[in-house]
């Protein structure tokens, strides 16, 4: 599902620095596709056409970035037959925060974990493993639910909340919800945890304990705070219209415990979890070690004209202005270099350059 997949790319990239209390203000997108000019009739069975994937993914990424107010100042798509089997969707971001707003402390027994942001649904169940497993002709019909459904406005509210130093200084430790859902986002915060899955806000009824625990629904954060700071933190969340609920406590016993409908459905020792499961060792054979990079070209006097025409007719050398213009590159008033420059505003910029974001006054940094 290209739209949701690309939106998840940028949404997840924003939440990673956000868990460190950083405000993301700068983004770039580099993607890879097959031949987008190929006839749709030549599309491989069970695959979406390359032009559909390319366009839909671009709109998914730009839609999320534009709504959340993130300047994307470098956008480039590369074309190569290898991207037909596995598309590339790369989102890179830069974030910053005042040093005094960042507190990193070890959780202690009695501390509580607050889940804030979006609600939990079945979207994204199995997403982390789904992106790596073998795809078949049925995948396009059966695997769509593995892609999370993003909500940029919800994440924008969390960004606003985390720019408030009075709020972030209450946080001892933070994690964003990504692969593995509650199991990972909350499970990584402390050695001993007791999680009540019935307290996790749901998008709709009918989810079982396993689905609640592993759902990768977006726009969710988990934070560790002291018991005496819960009311103040939740009150600040309410000011930004963000749902915030206490769902877990830190325990002395180093076990990850989950309760659902009055039953204990998970009880694992931390020392077992820290082994990271079974280690797999496989033998690999590199079959194309001598492959040449697409841009490694040679020419001669005799073939110069033909080689020049080959370069100019390559999709990788076509103007990407149409793609770049759907991304907001100036929101936030920190942009130094726009994606296109030069006398005719057609020359691609080779770097993403922006000033640091400040809430008051003007900066030249």
Predicted regions, residues:
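Glycine/proline-enriched, intrinsically flexible loops and inter-domain linkers
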Residues: 1-365
């Amino acid at each position: 599902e290209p739209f949701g997949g690309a939106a998840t790319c940028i949404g997840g990239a924003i939440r990673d620095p956000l868990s460190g209390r950083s405000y993301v203000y700068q983004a770039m997108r580099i993607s890879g596709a097959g031949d987008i000019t190929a006839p749709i009739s030549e599309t491989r069975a069970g695959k979406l056409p390359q032009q559909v994937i390319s366009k839909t993914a671009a709109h998914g990424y730009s839609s999320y970035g534009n709504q959340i107010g993130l300047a994307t100042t470098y956008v480039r798509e590369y074309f190569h037959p290898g991207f037909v089997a596995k598309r590339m969707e790369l989102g890179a971001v830069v974030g910053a925060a005042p040093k005094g707003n960042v507190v990193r402390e070890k959780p202690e027994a009695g501390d509580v974990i607050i889940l804030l942001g979006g609600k939990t649904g079945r979207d994204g169940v199995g997403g982390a493993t789904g992106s790596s497993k073998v795809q078949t002709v049925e995948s396009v019909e059966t695997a769509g639910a593995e892609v999370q459904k993003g909500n940029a406005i919800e994440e924008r509210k969390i960004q606003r909340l985390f720019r408030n130093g009075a709020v972030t200084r209450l946080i001892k430790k933070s994690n964003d919800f990504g692969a593995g859902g509650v199991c990972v986002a909350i499970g990584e915060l402390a050695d001993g945890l007791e999680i009540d899955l019935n307290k996790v806000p749901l998008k709709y009824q009918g989810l079982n304990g396993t689905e609640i625990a592993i759902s990768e629904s977006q726009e969710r954060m988990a934070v560790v705070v002291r018991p005496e700071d819960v009311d103040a933190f939740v009150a600040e969340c309410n000011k930004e219209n963000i749902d915030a609920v206490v769902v877990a406590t830190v325990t002395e016993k180093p076990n990850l415990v989950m309760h659902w409908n009055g039953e204990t459905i998970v009880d694992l020792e931390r020392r077992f979890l820290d082994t990271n499961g079974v280690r797999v060792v496989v033998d690999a054979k590199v079959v194309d070690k001598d492959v040449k990079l697409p841009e490694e070209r040679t020419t001669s006097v005799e073939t110069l004209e033909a080689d020049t025409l080959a370069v100019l007719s390559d999709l990788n050398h076509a103007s990407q202005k149409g793609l770049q213009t759907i991304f907001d590159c100036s929101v936030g008033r920190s942009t130094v270099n726009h994606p296109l420059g030069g006398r005719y505003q057609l020359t691609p910029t080779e770097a993403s350059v922006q000033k640091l974001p400040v809430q008051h006054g003007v900066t030249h940094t």
